[in-house]
Design a protein with these regions (language model features):
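Membrane-permeabilization and membrane-interfacing ectodomains
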Residues: 1-229
């Protein structure tokens, strides 16, 4: 509980929580993933939730800006490891501003405020393969569920060969290292991402991967949408 909410007090409290001996990697809020087939690179904007330049972010050769994927099958996925959330209570009097006049003066703008921030790790994965979609989907789902021994996923020979031959790109947010986000490629990096992603620590607590907003007018939930090009 933060007695006097504010940016400084929030980060101070967060720092104390991270340094606590009880702050360990066995208490993640959740691990979840979603995936879908794609044929054009711009479809991957759905994973990012915005109109971004997929070619720049995933370092796809400019010659493919016609949009269609290079290989027979494409699968993109978003893997989320939610470690913990920082949540602000609703204002006791219902007004996020200091007084009613400030709320009234901004009502025509429909202002919103950030109500919660979730820290964790996220991977946006692109897999292109000459195999059919059902085979790619099966291999991908298996990679997320099989055991790892000695840092290697215990995949069957067929699934491992498929993933080794596939073109895999992973944009990782919140992993180990000083970079907030980094792009890695290939089966070995895909395997490393899966095997090493189960825990977090005070050294690797994660980064903000989600936030929720509320309208200042009545504290109802704010939502948005976008249209891909």
């Amino acid at each position: 509980v933060i007695p006097t909410p504010g940016v400084v007090s929030m980060y101070t409290s967060l720092g104390k929580a991270v340094e606590s001996p009880k702050f360990s990697g066995q208490q993640s809020l959740s691990f979840e993933y979603d995936f879908r087939q794609f044929s054009y690179y711009n479809e991957m904007k759905l994973a990012f939730g915005g109109n971004i330049n997929i070619f720049n972010i995933l370092k796809i050769d400019a010659t493919y800006e016609s949009g269609k994927i290079k290989q027979k099958t494409g699968l993109f996925a978003r893997i989320l490891q939610k470690n913990f959330s920082v949540i602000m209570d609703y204002p006791t009097d219902g007004n996020i501003f200091k007084n009613q006049s400030d709320l009234a003066a901004t009502s025509h703008l429909s202002p919103v405020y950030i109500n919660s921030v979730t820290f964790g790790r996220m991977g946006i994965i692109s897999i292109e393969s000459e195999s059919n979609y059902e085979e790619v989907k099966k291999a991908f789902k298996l990679a997320l569920t099989v055991k790892a021994v000695g840092g290697e996923l215990q995949l069957d020979a067929t699934s491992k060969e498929l993933l080794e031959k596939a073109e895999i790109r992973i944009l990782v947010y919140g992993g180990a290292g000083s970079e907030v986000a980094k792009l890695v490629m290939g089966f070995d990096k895909f395997q490393e991402f899966i095997v090493n992603g189960g825990e977090f620590s005070k050294e690797v607590p994660g980064v903000p991967i989600f936030f929720t907003c509320n309208y200042a007018s009545d504290n109802s939930i704010f939502s948005t949408s976008f249209t891909t090009n």
